[in-house]
């Protein structure tokens, strides 16, 4: 006889193992109480048996834990993890800096990407490495990454290395300084014995003594000191940044018998800050000009400097903003989501002789105003829409452009000069812009209020192309069953950076009733219907918009109309996982659809069919034909707590 087949040999080995295991792990007993605590008792009509549970070995009356970690092949821990035996089982433990992932073993933890795992300094950059992370101080700073501070001279233009808490950081001294409110620093104050030995760092002078260091030699025995200190040089303009100057002390007939190095910076708003050092001797103190009492230049804008004229300080336009040619007049254009704003600088207008400014758009009812947010500019605003203020809309395949003309005059009547500036804002076509620039888009709207966050408006619209830039327009949509439906949902208003729009259930019905029992699900429980290969979900739960497409269809039976419905949810990206994870065959969960969060669109008519839709059916979906963009649903409010 030849050798037995390999299959038979394996069957014999396996059977022997089972027989041995059964014989070893099971014993008969009189009562279940005789079984070990880690055994299972089985009672039938005649026999009571004790069997050791999985992970234990013995006869059932006595069961001992199996050490799976010591038996080759008894555990499935990966090579880069450690097996730890536990009673009846085992666990796989990853080294520090790694995390156990199903099917992948130990994977590196990105401490830089997960909040609370890295402990770098606030200014440092976290760099992930395998099993750990590094903290790197920014350029110009020194430290180990857990602690960073700047070094003198390492900061950028207009900044200095200043103390903040226990560290040194780069900061603008116009914001990072201390104040000196001491009336006796005025050059009009008499003698005294003040000495500025404790002054080190950035200071701003305020109060009745004056707001600026004196720029001329101060007589001795003034400013409550013996040898007054004054600034040997002029104050800088705001565009010069931080400049170095010398402060001189007057004594014994010498206006600069002693000196100290100081730094000065002009700040927006007409005040100065000084990086002062202690004087070389006592009694020496810094003196201020009484004609510069705070308030004389508080109205200076960023285009102006505070200048002294015959001992008095006032605002003057910077030299850079003085122009004589109208062609050099600059305008600032801001293209916002809902409006356009064009502004002209007051200093340039003043240098051109415009003591009074009359500015208006193509529709003269839209006129200029002094910009509250920035006193340097005079502005005019128009909505980014076709029509208001004479704004004209032009559109191509990729952009929508709104254009208008700004007119400028220096008198109510015009004879010699008629200045006009053409301006335009172009917006790339996306779902929102394309809806905004269409006359009658097929769109549905729903208002949702999220507690403590604000009012959100969610819209759903039907588009003609896969780029979602050409919405269907008019009072109805007729398509063949070969055509594709491109459906877009979008979120407006509120804090869009925090919330993602999630389509939880999107389905079709043959009637306008969203609760119709006959439903065809396109998206169900957040995921696409896997048995319909024409369904493509482009975006869901990732941003403030959602998109999907499906080939047009008809319901079996005597149905020629299709209505679309989408249940939407505002997902908090800070506290929830918003992007769905969809794989394999999915089954209906049976969850109830919240009709207060459902958007409705329709009807969509199959091409070649003359649809008859009652007035009530249109009304139930809010289908109103108006001159403004068409809205296809009533506005509802839902509060999330």
UniProtKB/Swiss-Prot annotation:
Q: Where is the EGF-like domain?
A: 28-64, 65-107, 108-149, 292-323
What ranges does the record give for the region Beta hairpin, renumbered to this chain? 150-171
Its predominant location is membrane
Q: What positions does the domain ZP occupy?
A: 334-589
**What organism is the protein native to?**
Pongo abelii (Sumatran orangutan)
Name assigned to this protein:
Uromodulin
Lipid moiety-binding residues (GPI-anchor amidated serine): 614
Q: Which GO terms describe its cellular component?
A: apical plasma membrane; basolateral plasma membrane; ciliary membrane; cilium; extracellular region; membrane; side of membrane; spindle pole
User: What domain of life does the UniProt record list for this protein's source?
Assistant: Eukaryota
Carbohydrate attachment residues: 25, 76, 232, 275, 322, 447
* Keyword Hydrolase among UniProt keywords: no
Q: Where is the signal peptide?
A: 1-24
Compartments where found: Apical cell membrane; Basolateral cell membrane; Cell projection, Cilium membrane
Which cysteines pair up through disulfides? They are 32-41, 35-50, 52-63, 69-83, 77-92, 94-106, 112-126, 120-135, 137-148, 150-161, 155-170, 174-267, 195-282, 217-255, 223-287, 248-256, 297-306, 300-315, 317-347, 335-425, 366-389, 506-566, 527-582, 571-578
User: What are the boundaries of the region External hydrophobic patch (EHP)?
Assistant: 598-606
**Cleaved propeptide residues:** 615-641
Which intervals of the chain are annotated as region Essential for cleavage by HPN?
586-589
**Which stretches of sequence are listed as region ZP-N?**
334-429
Flexible ZP-N/ZP-C linker as annotated region, ranges: 430-453
